[in-house]
Amino acid sequence: MAAVPELTSEMMAYSSNNENDLFFEADGPGNDVKCCCQDLNHSSLVDEGIQLQVSHQLCNKSLRHFVSVIVALEKLKKPCPQVLQEDDLKSIFCYIFEEEPIICKTDADNFMSDAAMQSVDCKLQDISHKYLVLSNSYELRALHLNGENVNKQVVFHMSFVHGDESNNKIPVVLGIKQKNLYLSCVMKDGKPTLQLEKVDPKVYPKRKMEKRFVFNKIEIKNTVEFESSQYPNWYISTSQVEGMPVFLGNTRGGQDITDFTMEFSS
């Protein structure tokens, strides 16, 4: 290869007797050196009058990139005898840059939206006119009320959340107003079970609720059903018997009641 006429002072700064300094003058250590970029186009380097000699002691990707940059700069400084082709630029860039995949991670649970979360307050009655009442801290019961006792019925805070929405199913969560209690569905003794679960008011409700809290609201004429998203074909149900707990059932149109009327509350 033709020797580089003379290294500039900036380039000489890279030359030293330290074994970790890998650049030398053309007349420096000669017998033990070889080019770490053997896959470069040597003929093009000869044509351009560029000689690169590097120690074989260290040859890593960082050095390869550095050498490639110098080669590219030297080639670009000199007038090109022929028109620069696209492949020429491509070969230069291939030595300078390394393609790396960009992995975008999203966390659906932390998804936030600027839009206000939609919610409504409502009261529910089953089609036999039984009201839903909080009988103790963590249990709902269905019973008939009259007079002043009607005020004992619970008011639900129904929020619209993300879920598997379809034409006739709208994902919602049902919390008891002014209490940190939400209806949820869990497996107990091998059977899907409805329960009231206490939550952190600083966190709930949120747009991406855990699936156990989500119900698919299905409107049928003037009534609504609430199907568990966690357990499809299981519905919030009441018994024909007075005062029984509200439960999760898988019988529609039978002895158990799955149809409710909904009254919006201010």
Curated annotation (Swiss-Prot):
Site residues by UniProt (Important for interaction with integrin)? 169, 177, 179, 188, 202
Q: A cellular component term (GO) from this record?
A: extracellular space
Subcellular location per the Swiss-Prot or TrEMBL entry: Cytoplasm, Cytosol; Secreted; Lysosome; Secreted, Extracellular exosome
Q: Which GO terms describe its molecular function?
A: cytokine activity; integrin binding; interleukin-1 receptor binding
Ordered alphabetically, the record's keywords are: Cytokine, Cytoplasm, Inflammatory response, Lysosome, Mitogen, Pyrogen, Secreted
Gene3D superfamilies given in the database record: 2.80.10.50
Quick one: a GO biological-process term for this protein?
A: positive regulation of canonical NF-kappaB signal transduction
What residues does the annotated propeptide cover?
1-114
Which stretches are transmembrane?
Answer: none
InterPro entries named among the record's database cross-references: IL-1_CS, IL-1_fam, IL-1_propep, IL1/FGF
Residues forming coiled coils: none
Q: What is its main location?
A: cytoplasm
Pfam families (UniProt xref): IL1, IL1_propep
Does the record carry Secreted as a key word? yes
What's this protein's function? Potent pro-inflammatory cytokine. Initially discovered as the major endogenous pyrogen, induces prostaglandin synthesis, neutrophil influx and activation, T-cell activation and cytokine production, B-cell activation and antibody production, and fibroblast proliferation and collagen production. Promotes Th17 differentiation of T-cells. Synergizes with IL12/interleukin-12 to induce IFNG synthesis from T-helper 1 (Th1) cells. Plays a role in angiogenesis by inducing VEGF production synergistically with TNF and IL6.
Q: Which family does it belong to?
A: Belongs to the IL-1 family.
What more the UniProt record tells us is: IL1B production occurs in 2 steps, each being controlled by different stimuli. First, inflammatory signals, such as LPS, stimulate the synthesis and promote the accumulation of cytosolic stores of pro-IL1B (priming). Then additional signals are required for inflammasome assembly, leading to CASP1 activation, pro-IL1B processing and eventually secretion of the active cytokine. IL1B processing and secretion are temporarily associated.
> What does the subunit comment say?
Monomer. In its precursor form, weakly interacts with full-length MEFV; the mature cytokine does not interact at all. Interacts with integrins ITGAV:ITGBV and ITGA5:ITGB1; integrin-binding is required for IL1B signaling. Interacts with cargo receptor TMED10; the interaction is direct and is required for the secretion of IL1B mature form. Interacts with HSP90AB1; the interaction facilitates cargo translocation into the ERGIC. Interacts with HSP90B1; the interaction facilitates cargo translocation into the ERGIC.
Name the chain's protein. Answer: Interleukin-1 beta
